[in-house]
Amino acid sequence: MSDKGIEIVNLLAPKVEMLGFDLLGAEYLLVPSGAILRLYIDIPFAMQPECMVSIDDCERVSREVSAYLDLEEPISGNYTLEVSSPGLDRRLFTLEQFARHHNHLVKVGLKLQQHGSRRLQGKIVRVEQVGGFVVLLVNGVELAVDFNNIDKARIVPDWSALGLAPLEKSKHDTKKMSQGSKKPSNESAARQAVRGVIR
């Protein structure tokens, strides 16, 4: 996560937990119209897989978080708030999340080149908390990746094992902010990809 994403997660995580969900991570993206703040929420790990995040859950969290952000104002200028379930191809934001998905296949994008590349794909072998490394099995070779050098990481679902064909990523319309407003509208966009409903 970016520094801004970490700041927002630290601010919002207690609020989201009060609503009964875990805040997995946040993306803060600058766009011509302002910014997009995308939050990923999930059911607490102890309650999985019996329960899962619904569209109504995303909308409820979006409403509560939007009102809270209006008070705290951690973001200046216009922005759109999106709340999503993680989906099968979930983003991984923390070392704990990497450890939880041991032996899963992941795609990793790096800030700086490591092991001759800025893009790696392999299975999560283990997480070394001391030193902050994620060890991946890439083409039969174990590679230690510095967690602080990871820009983005995402699970690669085994679609064939799930009996599913991969879904194309759909584009989600977001509500535009008024041009003259410096503050976000309370009408934040709550979204959930179709892939997020299936576990």
Swiss-Prot record:
Superkingdom field: Bacteria
Q: Does the keyword Cell membrane apply?
A: no
- Do the record's keywords include Cytoplasm? yes
Keywords from the UniProt entry: Cytoplasm, Ribosome biogenesis
* Location(s) in or outside the cell: Cytoplasm
- A Pfam family: DUF150_C
Gene Ontology terms: biological process: ribosomal small subunit assembly; translation
The principal localisation class reads cytoplasm
Give the Polar residues compositional bias ranges. 177-189
Alphabetized CDD domains for the sequence: YlxS_C
Enumerate the residue ranges of region (Disordered). Answer: 170-199
A GO cellular component term found in this entry reads: cytosol
The family database entries (HAMAP family) matched by this protein are listed as: RimP
The family this protein is said to belong to: Belongs to the RimP family.
Q: What does this protein do?
A: Required for maturation of 30S ribosomal subunits.
What protein name does the entry list? Ribosome maturation factor RimP
